[in-house]
Amino acid sequence: MVTELVAQRRDLANLLGVEPSDEPIHVFLFEKPADYRQYMLNKHPDFPARRALFVKTDTQLKIYASWHPRVGEDLRHEVTHGYLHSAVSDIPLWMDEGLAEFFETGRGKRGSHGAHIHLLKTRLKQGKWSPDIHRLETLDQAETMTQLDYAESWLWVHFLLFNPQVRDQHLIQAHLIQLRKHGSAFGIADAIDEKFDSIESVLIEHLKSL
């Protein structure tokens, strides 16, 4: 598992064009989930109740998690946050979480996330969801995000990285590089509006192809 997490650093750099810093990421892995929950309740009572958490302080990057059947997924997700935040500040929440959902699937899977695909296709068929990246860009608190928000954030990331109609624009890569250089960057939603018409229908076709 450790080898995979270390290799993920290079995978992220190669895909996104940003090099994480050499700042260490401290992982606190509890043997029992109950011990983890109690520790987080005592030390970080204001944090949301999650199976694992990434915490960035002024001096350290920390991950808290516990052993359980999906610990690998959790660590890949949180380590992605660590690598991203060591390289770039002020990443939009939807992109931060979408990339973490992308990389949590493991190496060699090109970010394919079966649970998100199923959820989005089901809600689309029921008429209970339609994509809206402008709405995602307004999200600024992870604890308010729903599972559908995570799924849609993942889909936009996967779409922008791999769909042949948009991938050559390198929008995510350009956004992150601009953030790193200048501390601020163009909005992805506005850039999409300028370059494409009816991009939501293209996104839905991308989803249906997965």
Which sequence ranges carry the predicted segments?
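Hydrophobic (often cysteine-bearing) scaffold residues that line and stabilize catalytic clefts
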Residues: 1-4, 72, 76, 92, ...
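Solvent-exposed coil/turn segments that connect beta secondary-structure elements
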Residues: 30-34, 68, 79, 87, ...
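Acidic helix-start/capping segments at beta-turn-to-alpha-helix junctions
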Residues: 18-38, 98-104
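Acidic/His/Gly-enriched intrinsically disordered linker/tail segments
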Residues: 40-66, 87-210
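Helical anchoring/docking segments at protein termini
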Residues: 2-7, 20-22, 55-67, 81
